Amino acid sequence: YFSDTLQLISDLPGEFLKKPVGKLGSIYCSKWHYNDRAAIFGDAAHTIVPFFGQGMNASLQDCTVMYSFVKKYDGNWDKIFTKFSEKQVPNGHAIADMALENYIEMRDSVNDPKYKIKRELEFDLENKFWDRFVPRYSMVSFHELPYSEVYRRGEVQSKLMYSFIGGDLTKKKLYEQIESNLTPIR
C-alpha cells in the first residue's frame, strides 16, 4: 500500500474509469515464412499474453535459431525458412499456451486447496529428483530447453502429481514413473 499515491491522483475513480481497457491475446501461426522470400519472428510470429515473462526471450531465441540455420544452409533461403518454421512454430505455440495457463493459474488456482497440495508435492519432488523433476518456470528461466519440451515435461509432471494426489499412484509408483518418464536435464 502506497498511501502517498492518493495525493498525486486528484480524481482516482474518474481517472481509472476514463482509461481504455486494453485487450490481451495470443497469435498462433501455422508457419512463419513464405517460400524463400520472407520470415517472421518475435512478436510478429508469436504474440503472447505477458504472464510468463518470455516475450523478449522467445524473440531472441528465434534470432539464435534463425542464425544457426543461416550458417548451416548457406544461402538456401527456402530450406533456412522451412527448417526455422518447423523448429520454432511448436515452441511459439508452447510458450503461448504456458503463458495463458500461467494466467489462469494465478487467477483461479492459488486459493484452491488442491492446488496448494500440488505445489507442496511439486517442491518435495523437485528436492528429491532435482535433476529430473523441474517446475516449468525453472525449466524456462534456468535451462536452455525448447519451449515445446518444457511444455511436454510440464504436462507429464502435472499428470503424475494429480494421479498421486487422486490416489491412482502410490509413492513408489510415482517415483518409478518419474525415473522412467523424465530424463535428467541438469
Regions inferred by a protein language model and the residue ranges of each:
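FAD/FMN-dependent oxidoreductases across multiple families
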Residues: Y1-D78
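C-terminal helical "tail/cap" subdomain of flavin- and related membrane-associated enzymes
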Residues: Q7, S68-R186
